[in-house]
Amino acid sequence: MGPIRPALAPWPRHLLRCVLLLGGLRLGHPADSAAALLEPDVFLIFSQGMQGCLEAQGVQVRVIPVCNASLPAQRWKWVSRNRLFNLGAMQCLGTGWPATNTTVSLGMYECDREALSLRWQCRTLGDQLSLLLGARANNASKPGTLERGDQTRSGHWNIYGSEEDLCARPYYEVYTIQGNSHGKPCTIPFKYDNQWFHGCTSTGREDGHLWCATTQDYGKDERWGFCPIKSNDCETFWDKDQLTDSCYQFNFQSTLSWREAWASCEQQGADLLSITEIHEQTYINGLLTGYSSTLWIGLNDLDTSGGWQWSDNSPLKYLNWESDQPDNPGEENCGVIRTESSGGWQNHDCSIALPYVCKKKPNATAEPIQPDRWANVKVECDPSWQPFQGHCYRLQAEKRSWQESKRACLRGGGDLLSIHSMTELEFITKQIKQEVEELWIGLNDLKLQMNFEWSDGSLVSFTHWHPFEPNNFRDSLEDCVTIWGPEGRWNDSPCNQSLPSICKKAGRLSQGTAEEDHGCRKGWTWHSPSCYWLGEDQVIYSDARRLCTDHGSQLVTITNRFEQAFVSSLIYNWEGEYFWTALQDLNSTGSFRWLSGDEVMYTHWNRDQPGYRRGGCVALATGSAMGLWEVKNCTSFRARYICRQSLGTPVTPELPGPDPTPSLTGSCPQGWVSDPKLRHCYKVFSSERLQEKKSWIEALGVCRELGAQLLSLASYEEEHFVANMLNKIFGESEPENHEQHWFWIGLNRRDPREGHSWRWSDGLGFSYHNFARSQHDDDNIRGCAVLDLASLQWVAMQCQTQLDWICKIPRGVDVREPDIGRQGRLEWVRFQEAEYKFFEHHSSWAQAQRICTWFQAELTSVHSQAELDFLGQNMQKLSSDQEQHWWIGLHTSESDGRFRWSDGSVINFVSWAPGKPRPIGKDKKCVYMTARQEDWGDQRCHTALPYICKRSNSSGETRPHDLPPSTLGGCPSGWNQFLNKCFRIQGQDPQDRVKWSEAQFSCEQQEAQLVTIANPLEQAYITASLPNVTFDLWIGLHGSQRDFQWIEQEPLLYTNWAPGEPSGPSPAPSGTKPTSCAVILHSPSAHFTGRWDDRSCTEETHGFICQKGTDPSLSPSPAAALPAPGTELSYLNRTFRLLQKPLRWKDALLLCESRNASLAHVPDPYTQAFLTQAARGLQAPLWIGLASEEGSRRYSWLSEEPLNYASWQDGEPQHTGGCAYVDVDGTWRTTSCDTKLQGAVCGVSRGPPPPRISYRGSCPQGLADSSWIPFREHCYSFHTELLLGHKEALQRCQRAGGTVLSILDEMENVFVWEHLQTAETQSRGAWLGMNFNPKGGMLVWQDNTAVNYSNWGPPGLGPSMLSHNSCYWIQSSSGLWRPGACTNVTMGVVCKLPRVEENGFLPSAALPENPVALVVVLTAAVLLLLALLTGALILYRRRQSAERGSFEGARYSRSSRSGPAEATEKNILVSDMEMNEQQE
C-alpha cells in the first residue's frame, strides 16, 4: 500500500467505523475540514451580473444569491492540470456533450474523467461561465436561483469579497520529498481508498506525516511522497549542525531542475544550500562521505548584470570550484556539489534534473529582510579624507600593486577598503571612486585559496561580484579583488597588477548627528541629494500627493538600487504597513511613470507584481517583503507615504540602463529597422530549422555578441512598432495561423534574489507590461518571457525552450563582427562539392555551430575516407599539437541519445577512436576529430575547441520520401507484402540464426537479398512486425572500412541508428570483406526497439530479413496497401479508426467519443510504427490523445497513463498548452489545440478494459525506508547514490530484510535498467546477487536457485569468470551483465524483497455451537469492541494533533550516527510496466 500502513487491521477498522457512526462520531479528514476556512487558495466565485455565487448542486452548478463562505458547495480551488475543484461535491467543474443534444452541458464530474473538458483557462473562465450558464436562461430555475442569460453575459466574475479576478489564487506545484516518486509534484486532487483528497493528508499514516499521491489514483500506481512542511524546527527530514545551528536536507531520492529544487526548499521555509565557511564545507563533506551523487546547491549566476551568488543572499566569500571551473558560464548558470571530487563545485545547465540539498536556520522562517542601517553618528577626519557612517575614506590615485597599496594605507593609519552594505558601496561609487575605472579594495584570498576575507579583519557580510566572477581565471592565482564599473561590481585579479586604491579607517567621534541636516527641515532625513520625510497618516493616493505638495516636496521617486536601500532602511520598523511612492499607471495603459514624467530606469517589484490589471498606484511593502513594490488601488487603498525634496542636482539613473540616451538621428545597421520616433533599431531572428532556435540565455548571448540586447519594451508605442515589424515579416493573418510562434524578449525573473519579480536583461526598469492573462502561472518554473505572434502579448515560458528571438541595438551603433579571433584559413577551401573553413580560436560546440550559421554553413559532416583525409591534412597544418581536437557536426540529442549530423545528413561513415564513443547517457555529447589520427571521440559540448564549418548548395536534410509507385503483383506463400515489396523474417528457430554472409546467401537462395530500408515508411512496417520477435535481425547494411552501404550499392538515404550507434567497424584484415554489419534490434526497451546497431559480421549469429520485389503474376495481398480513412484497423489487440477531415483537437476528441472511442493512446514503438503507416497513407498529420497542461510543456495522455514512451521530433515538445499529433514522417509534434489538422486517430473501446493484475501485499513505507518501488510480486530499493563493495551490499540488503538484486526474466531486467540508466552519473552499475556454485558447476542466486535467464554483454562469460573470486553486476548504461572482481570494486546497490502480506481477519471460521462458548465469544467481542473504540478515540486525537503540524512523535534523523547504509535512497520513477501486463 505504498505510504499507507493502517493503524488497525482491515476488519476492525470497518467494524469500528460502524460503531463510531452509531455513537455520533465520524471518521473523516479533520485536517482537511478544520483548515478549510483558512486555506488561502480556496475562494468563492461571484457574478457581478447575477449578484450571486457559483454553487455545486449535485451534478449541476447554479448561481445562488446568498454567498456563504462556510458552505463547501460554494468553495472552489484551482488544482493541477488546470482544473477547478469544488470542496462540497469533491468533483471538478467540466463540460459534457450529450449525444442527443448539441448544447454543451456545464456540471460537476469525477476529476479522473478522460477528457480535456475539465481544464479551464482562468483568464477566460468568466466568459465561459457567462456563456454556458446563459444557455440555460430559458430553463426552469429552482427557487432561490437567478439564471438571467443577459445579465450573465454582460456580468463580470471575480473572487467574492475582493477585487481579485479568477486568476488571483493560482495553483502551485507542491514538490514531494522522499517517497518513491523522486520529488515529482503532487497530483491534486488524488484518489486514495476510493476517496478524493484536494490537498496533502495524513490519512492512513500512524506517524501523522502529511503525504500525497503523485498520480491521480494511488491505488492503481502506488506513487507517493511526503509533503513539504514549513516549521521552525529541524526534527523531521533534517540534519542539524550543532555548532552553527544550521539544518540540512539531502534529497538524494529526488531529481529536479534547479528552479524546481529551489521551489521545493522554499516550500519548507528553507533555501538551496549555501556554503560560506570552510567548517561548513567540511561538515557537508562528512555527510556526503560514502555517497556518489551530484546535487544542486544555491550557487547561481542567474543575475545577468551580476556575478555568482547564493540564492539565500549569503555573501559569496568562500569558493570550492573544481579545477577549470566554472566553465561555459554563458549557458551553465547553476552550481552543483559533487561527491566524486570530495565536495568540489561545478556549474551545470540549470534545466537538467538532479538531486539537491536544502538548508535552513531553525526559528528563522519569517524574519523580514534586514535592510542596510544608517549610523546616526558624526565623525571628524584628517584632511583629504571623507567621512561617512563613522569611518573616513581616501582615494589613492597612485597606481600600485595590491600589497603596496595596503602598506600605503597602513602608513596613513587605515587599511584597504572593506565594504559591508549597499549604502556604503553607493558612497564609494558616487563620492570616492568617481571617474576611476578600476581600483583595489581589501578583499583577498591570500591566506587560503578561494576563501575571501577583508584585509582589515572585519567580517565579510556583503559581496557584489561582476558577471561571471569570481572565477580565478584559468587558475591564474587571482587572489586580490578590484572594484570597477559604474555599479561598483567586484572582480578577482592578480595582486601584482598596478591600480589606484581606496583606504578606510575609523573616524574620530564628534558632537552632533551625522551629516548635520544639509538644509533639511526638522524631522526630515537627508540622503544625497535630497531630504526625505515619512508621512504617518494613512491616506488615499491623491491625498498623499497633496500632503507632500503642501510640504514643498513630491512623493518619493526611486531611481537606483542605492536609493532603494536607503528608503528600505527608513521604513524598516513599520512592519505590516505600506508607503505610497510617485509611481503610477496614469492612463491605465499598463505603462508606469513617475509623477515627474521621468522614465522608469529602475524597478523593485514584489512577486506577481505589477500583476495583469491596468492602472493603479505603487506602494512599498514592509515586513518580509521589505521595500518591494506593489500596485494598489489609487482611490480605495490607504497607506502612509514618503515625501522627497531634492536639494541638489537632478537624480542620475543607475546604470546599466540605456545610457547615454541613444540618438534619434543615428542610422541602423544593414538588416535592422526602426521608426523615426524610436532611439533603437530592431531585428527578428527566426528560422524554420529547430537547430537554429535558441534558449533564452543563448538568445541573449547572440544579441550581446552583436553588441545588442534582447528586446526590451518601455512603452506601448515601441511595442506597436515591433508588432508592425512582425506583421510585415509574417503577414497580418488570422491569429490562429500564428498560434504558438513565440519570440524571446529580455524580460525574465531568473535571479532568485529578486523575489520572483520581472526584470529586463538590459537593465531597463520594468515599467510597461503587456502580459496575456496567464492561467495557473507557475512562477517557480517559467522564468522568461516571450512575445506571442498571435496575440502580440507576452507569455511566461520555461527559459530552456528553443525559440526565435528579437534583438535591439541603439541607433548609430555598428553591429559587431563575430569575434572569431585569429583564423588559420581566411578563405573557404573547396573540396569536391562543398567548401570548408577552419577556425583556430576555441569555442564551445554550440557557439561554434552558431558561428558557422552566420556564414550560411554548419559544423562539418564527414561522409567518406577521402573527405576525412582532406580534413585531417588541413587540421595538421593548423595544429601546433598534432593531438589537437577539432569540433565536427556530430552530436547526440538529450531526448534520445542518438547521434546526428548538425546539417541533417545521414550517418554513413564513422571513424571512432578505440574506446569511443563512450556509453550513452543523459547528457548531450558532441564529437571531435583529432588532427593526426583523424579519429573521433565524444566529450562535453561545453569544452572550448577549434572547429570546422562546411557549406554546400545541396541540403543534407532528409524529407519524407514519396510513396513508391503502385505496382500490381503479390508475394509467394510465407512472404508478407507491403506496397511493392515482399518481406520474410527468418530465425524463429535458433538453429536458423546465422552470420551476416550466410544470411545473405540464404536470401539469394530464395531469389531475394537482405532487406534494404529506404525510408521511414518501410522502417515503420518492419518495426510493426516485431512484437513477437525475440532476437535481433540482420539487414543489408554493412561496412567494409569506415563507411556503410547497402548491398548492390544502393544509396544510403535513410538511417535509424540506436542511441550511441554506430560505434564503427572493426579494423578489416583486408579491404574487401565487410567487418561491421547492421542489425535491427528487438530490444524490449522502447529506446532501442526497431533501431539499428552495427555488429561483427563474422562473430555473431542472428535472424535476418529477406526482401524481394512483388511478382506481377500473383494477386496482391489485401494487407499490402496503406490504411484508408474511415476503416477500423486492428493491431496488437487494439482497434483504431482513422478520421480524415479538418478538425481541431477538441473536435477530434468529440468525434471519437461519439463513436465509443477516444483519441488514440500510443504506448509503445510497435503501435507508433503502425500509426506511422496510417499517417503516411493519408499524407496528413493526425491528432492523438496527448496534450499538455495550459502553460506547461509537460504532456500526458488523456487516459492518465504515464508517458513512458515518446517519439518526439527533435526539439519537441515545443508548445505550452498544446496538443500532439503524429506527423507524416511518424514523429510527434505539437501545435495549438485550436489548429485544424486534416485528420485524427481514434482508439476504439471494445468492452471493459482487460483486468489489471493485482498483487497482494505492500512495500515498506517508514520514514527511513520509504522509497521501495513495487513491481509485480516484489519491492525494490535503488541505492545508486551509494558505492559499496559486494560484501557491504549483501550486508545492507540483509539489514533491510531483503537480498541483493536478482533478475529472473527480460521484463524484470528492463525494469531495473530503466532505473539504473537514469542514474548512471552516480553509478556505472549495481551488484547482482549471484555467485558460482562449484558443486553444481553453475551460477546461482542468493537463495541457491539456478540462474536460468541471463543478459551477458560481449564478450560473454568466460570460464575464468566462474569462480569464487568473481562477482557480477548489471551495467547502468546498457542493462547488460558483466563479470568482475569482488574486491576493490564499488557499485550501486539494489535490494529486493517480496511484498509484505497484510494480516487480515479470516471470516470463514464458524461460530461455536456450544451456548457457553457462544457467550464467551460474544463477551470477548464486546470487550474487544470497547478496546477498539478507546484505541480509535486515542488515535483520532493523535491524528488531529499531528495534522495541526505536530511532529513530536516523529524521530527520523539522518544524523552522524546513521551513515550511508541508513540513508534515504535515491530513486528513479518506475515505469508502470506492471500495470500493462496481461494475464496469460
Curated annotation (Swiss-Prot):
Signal sequence region: 1-30
- Pfam families tied to this protein: CysR_MRC2_N (PF24562), fn2 (PF00040), Lectin_C (PF00059)
Which segments of the protein form a coiled coil according to its record? Answer: none
What GO terms in the biological process aspect are recorded for it?
A: collagen catabolic process; endocytosis
Q: Which cysteines are joined by disulfide bonds?
A: 53-67, 92-111, 186-212, 200-227, 265-358, 334-350, 409-503, 480-495, 617-634, 703-807, 784-799, 852-949, 926-941, 1077-1097, 1219-1233, 1367-1382
Q: TM spans, by residue?
A: 1414-1434
The record ties this protein, via SUPFAM superfamilies, to:
C-type lectin-like, Kringle-like, Ricin B-like lectins
PTM per UniProt?
A: N-glycosylated.
Primary subcellular site in the record, as a coarse category: membrane
- Sites carrying sugar chains: 101, 139, 363, 1028, 1348
Q: Which domain of life is it from?
A: Eukaryota
Q: Which residues form the C-type lectin domain?
A: 243-359, 388-504, 527-643, 677-808, 831-950, 978-1106, 1131-1242, 1271-1391
Question: What membrane topology does the UniProt entry give?
Answer: Single-pass membrane protein
Comment on protein domains: C-type lectin domains 3 to 8 are not required for calcium-dependent binding of mannose, fucose and N-acetylglucosamine. C-type lectin domain 2 is responsible for sugar-binding in a calcium-dependent manner.
The entry's localization annotation reads: Cell membrane
A single GO molecular function term of this UniProt record: collagen binding
- Record keywords, A-Z: Calcium, Cell membrane, Disulfide bond, Endocytosis, Glycoprotein, Isopeptide bond, Lectin, Membrane, Phosphoprotein, Receptor, Repeat, Signal, Transmembrane, Transmembrane helix, Ubl conjugation
All ranges on the Cytoplasmic side of the membrane: 1435-1480
Got a GO cellular component term for this one? plasma membrane
Annotated region Disordered: the residues are 1446-1480
State the name under which the record lists this protein. Answer: C-type mannose receptor 2
Report the residue ranges that make up the Ricin B-type lectin domain in this protein: 40-166
Q: Does the keyword ATP-binding apply?
A: no
Q: How does it assemble?
A: Interacts directly with PLAUR/UPAR and PLAU/pro-UPA to form a tri-molecular complex. Interacts with collagen V. Interacts with C-terminal region of type I collagen/COL1A1.
Please report the stretch or stretches of sequence annotated as the Fibronectin type-II domain: 181-229
